[in-house]
């Protein structure tokens, strides 16, 4: 298990399709079937969602970026996300400033580097982003570069997020052991369908609980 996803995603896709079939056979919504088997029959009917956007594309100016983020807010989202690292640091900060003009009380911005930064760049962004009350700073470096992730806690005290591109319980455990993630503020983003399916995902959740994560 582990690696960069070709095997785990294929198996996870099949696994989730099988679970969907089982739910159809039993005549239940899949969320209720899983709650019956793993959640004492009590599904959580409220989940956290956010609107991801803020990509880079030709012709996009700050006005269009603000319009995009405003459209998410108008649809009821309280957390929105934009990409970083596709422009210079200074330009990314200007883009963030533009979005901040749109957000009101109770609304927050996440930023996502999609693993593109080396350590020096990740630190430079961490220092610059510290001036904002961001919801999180996501995946600054390669998801398997636990040393980089751990180093950032010395430069960024606000919430960070990673784990979306880790695909097994072993990878998740190594992130907890060596990545410097903080249970009181940081976010772990493991994805069931990408992580060999439900069985491996449940193993990952159990490991997190053992290490003090909710």
Which stretches of residues belong to each language-model region?
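N-terminal capping/lid subdomain adjacent to the active-site entrance of alpha/beta enzymes
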Residues: 1-109, 114-123, 127-131
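Catalytic core of soluble alpha/beta enzymes
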Residues: 82-214
């Amino acid at each position: 298990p582990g690696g960069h996803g070709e095997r785990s995603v294929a198996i996870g896709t099949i696994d989730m399709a099988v679970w969907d079939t089982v739910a159809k056979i039993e005549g239940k919504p899949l969320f209720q079937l899983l709650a019956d088997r793993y959640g004492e029959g009590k599904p959580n009917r409220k989940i956290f969602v956010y609107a991801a956007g803020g990509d880079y594309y030709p012709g996009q100016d700050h006005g269009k970026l603000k319009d995009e983020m405003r459209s998410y807010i108008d649809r009821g989202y309280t957390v929105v996300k934009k990409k970083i690292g596709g422009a210079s640091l200074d330009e990314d900060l200007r883009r963030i400033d533009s979005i901040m003009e749109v957000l009101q009380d109770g609304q927050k911005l996440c930023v996502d580097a999609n693993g593109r930064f080396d350590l020096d760049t990740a630190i430079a962004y961490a220092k610059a982003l510290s001036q904002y009350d961001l919801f999180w700073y996501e995946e600054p470096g390669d998801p398997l570069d636990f040393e980089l992730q751990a180093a950032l806690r010395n430069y960024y005290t606000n919430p960070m997020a990673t784990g979306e591109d880790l695909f097994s319980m072993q990878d998740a455990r190594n992130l907890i052991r060596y990545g410097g993630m903080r249970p009181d503020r940081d976010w772990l983003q493991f994805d069931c369908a990408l992580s060999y399916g439900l069985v491996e995902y449940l193993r990952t959740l159990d490991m997190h609980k053992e290490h003090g994560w909710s």
